[in-house]
C-alpha cells in the first residue's frame, strides 16, 4: 500500500485568527471560517483544526439530522462507583483518552457553511 501525504496543521497555538490558507483539508471562505469559529466556545483559541467530513461522517450526520426523536448513534449508560476515589480515577483516565484522541474533541458544524465541517 502507498503512503498517504497528510498536510501538517497550520493553525498555530495562540493565534489570533484563522485564514483559508491555514486549512488545507477544508475549502472555506473567510466568512465561513469566521462563522465556524463563532460557534466554538472560547473562539479561535479553542480551534485546533477544521476539515471536511469523511463520507461515513456525512452519513452519520445525515441520520442524526433526519432523526425526529433521539439519535441512532448515541447510546447512554449508567455507571456506579463504590467510592469517590474510584470515580475520580475513572474521570482522570477518561480525560487522558479525550486529550489523546482528536475525534473525541470534534464537533460537526452545519450552520454558516456551504458544506458541513468538523472542528477539533
What are these regions (language model features)?
Residues 2-51:
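Flexible, low-complexity inter-domain linkers and amphipathic docking helices that mediate domain-domain
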Amino acid at each position: 500500500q502507498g503512503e498517504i501525504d497528510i498536510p501538517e496543521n497550520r493553525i498555530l497555538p495562540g493565534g489570533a485568527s484563522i485564514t483559508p490558507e491555514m486549512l488545507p483539508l477544508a475549502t472555506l471562505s473567510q466568512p465561513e471560517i469566521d462563522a465556524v469559529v463563532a460557534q466554538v466556545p472560547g473562539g479561535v483559541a479553542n480551534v485546533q483544526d477544521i476539515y471536511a467530513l469523511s463520507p461515513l461522517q456525512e452519513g452519520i450526520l445525515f441520520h442524526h439530522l433526519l432523526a425526529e426523536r433521539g439519535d441512532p448513534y448515541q447510546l447512554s449508560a449508567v455507571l456506579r462507583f463504590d467510592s469517590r476515589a474510584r470515580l475520580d480515577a475513572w474521570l482522570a483516565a477518561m480525560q487522558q483518552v479525550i486529550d489523546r484522541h482528536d475525534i473525541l474533541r470534534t464537533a460537526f458544524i452545519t450552520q454558516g457553511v456551504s458544506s458541513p465541517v468538523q472542528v477539533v
